[in-house]
Each structure stands twice: as structure tokens, then as C-alpha cells.
Amino acid sequence: TLGNERLALVGESGSGKSMTARALMGLVRKPGVVSAERLEVLGRDVLTLSARGWRALRGNDIAMVLQDPRYALNPVQSIQTQLEEALTLHQRLSRRARAEAVKDAIAAVGLDLPVLSRYPGELSGGMGQRVMIALALLNNPKVLIADEPTSALDARLRNQILELLVEQSAQRQMAMLLISHDLPLVAAHCDRVLVMYQGRQVDEMPARALPSATHPYTRTLWTCRPNAHTYGQMLPTLDRTQDFTETAHGDR
């Protein structure tokens, strides 16, 4: 259940984080199958939605920021064209109102108006990610899914982008699902954490409790991070002989 909060989904590569996000967005392609009795998004069972129902929901009530703008943005269309296209899919606006909405969206993510005339290949990684966020927020969604939005950025830009997402989610009273490998960022910017292993949730906790996690899988994820104190030392690794899906009493 996702309330009006910032929920993080963490786990090693292949644990099912991005696939969970794709299921929520209706983007699991055949032969993939989503198996559940119900899968509710904003009170609607999305497993029963028609293609028309998905078009109304996706990009409007629920939106997604992907990992890399180089692959998510259209390389042969200007930023303004892509933003206006996202608006016309969900709103009927005059040309003037559409232009104003696009300018407001760009300003909200800290970019200057000349960016609108540029193409994705002319943008830096940080600028491209801000454009992706502007696209996702354009129709004021109630839920934002951010799938590794900082993975291609350096440490300084990672913090800037996460702070922008937190600021926008608070201003818009918008729920956010953040998928990330960066546990310190999650601990600093999120409210709650779900930990996934082999396609299953094995742990749940307040984000601030990550450094003191007791579940063996979560604890290893936290301690295997390199830092200044572990320079030159062998980092802990996961004990693959242990069944992490068998959670201890009190863990979920």
C-alpha cells in the first residue's frame, strides 16, 4: 500500500524492482504475465483495465521517470515538442495555455527557457533528467514512480535530483515510489523502505532505520557499500547458501 509518502524499493539487480514498477504501469510485455488476485492503483484494479483505461491512467494519474534520458526521450524532437505532445494526450488546452504550461513545467525543475528549443542530444545528463521529471509532472500525477533516476549521474547531481523529486512530491502532495540501489540516498530522502529479494518482499522498515537493519539481507546490502572507512578492505558479500526469503520473527 502506498499512501501520501515517499516509498523506496531496494534490492540487488534482478530482485524484481523495475519489473514491479512496470507491472504498476501496465508495461509488462508478453510473454510476461502479471499474476495477482488484484493490483490496485489509486483504487482501481489495473488488471481489469482496457487499453483505453490504461491510456487515461498512465501519464495522467500515475507517471514514471526512467533511468536514462538518452533512451527515454525522442532524439529527433525538440524538448518543447515532446512536452507539448505529453500535454495534448491528456488535456484540451489552447495553444497559448499549452505554451504557458510547458514554460511552467521547465521552470519548476530549475531549467531555463532556452532548453525548450534544444534536442536531447544537446543536454547534459543532469539537464536530461530534469526534462524527464518535467515530462512526468506535466499532468500533475497523484503517483510518481522514479526508476533509478540518479544511476547515470555523479554524486553531486544525484543529491540535486533527489532533492528536486522530494520538493515536488511535497509541493504537489504526490506519492512517490523510488527504485534505487543507493541506500544512503534512500535513508536520507524517503519515508519507508521495502526490500526485495528474488521477486519477493523480504523486509520493510522506516527509511531512517536502514543503518540499523536486522534482517540479514538488508544488513548486508547496507554494509557492503564502499566508503572512506573501508578503503583497502574486503567488503562483505551475500552468503548465497542462506535462504533470505525465510525471514526472522518480526521481519517482513
List the predicted regions and their residue ranges.
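Conserved ABC ATPase signature
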Residues: Y119-L123, M127
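A short, surface-exposed alpha-helical micro-motif characterized by mixed small hydrophobic
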Residues: V186-A188
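Short catalytic/signature loops enriched in Gly
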Residues: R6, L116, E204-R252
